[in-house]
Amino acid sequence: MNTGTLVMLHGMTGTSEKMQSLADSLAPSGWKVICPQAEIEHPTRGGYAWWLRAEDPTLPLRKESQQQVLDSMQRVIRDIPDGPVIIGGFSQGGAIASALLETELHERIVGLVLIGTKTVRPDKLAESLPFLKPREIVWMHGRRDHLVTFEVAIEHAEIFESAGWPVTRLEHEKGHMVNLNQLDELKSSIQRMANSI
């Protein structure tokens, strides 16, 4: 059996420790798990962030925030061991995971896990996908998410679908969270990704 690494990235104000138990429960049989931690301390709410922003989360990122995204992407790449990778995350972590398709790491990514997230670089993502081999994505989002609205989040899934990538959509009626009622479906999707190599 081929093995690899499941990489799961926490959201804003999260920590690698908070992501670890979810990641462990989702890991394909025989796969390693790593949960890198962002390096930017959140100035008011505790925990860590992959980038900071003061303005409306539906607006494009300012130049400083865009640089923080790029720096965070490189920091995550440094932590990832050799071999196949399934990469995902919650909220900001999912946005970083998706953006990693725009890097040299894309050759080793066998699947994406996008939970309660959106793309922070929609144009870059849409430009890069036609040049990449499609791979499976599992996308989870709540219709009552007040931080990343469902309408904004669906754009992320649709960018992949428009490029012919297979997306398993796990929609739920809850808010900005991992829906534990769909954990088995999430785990099955991730195992399929691992089985594809």
Language-model regions, residue ranges each:
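Gly/Ala-rich beta-loop-alpha elbow adjacent to hydrolase catalytic centers
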Residues: 89-93, 97
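A conserved short beta-strand
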Residues: 107-119
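Active-site glycine-rich loops that stabilize anionic/oxyanionic intermediates
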Residues: 11-14, 118, 143
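Flexible "cap/lid" loop of the alpha/beta hydrolase fold
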Residues: 45-51, 117-137
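Serine-hydrolase catalytic machinery in alpha/beta-hydrolase-like enzymes
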Residues: 3-82
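Short beta-strand/loop motif that positions the catalytic acidic residue
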Residues: 138-141, 145
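C-terminal catalytic histidine-bearing segment of alpha/beta-hydrolase fold enzymes
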Residues: 151-157, 161-197
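Short beta-strand immediately N-terminal to the catalytic nucleophile in serine-hydrolase-like folds
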Residues: 87-89, 115
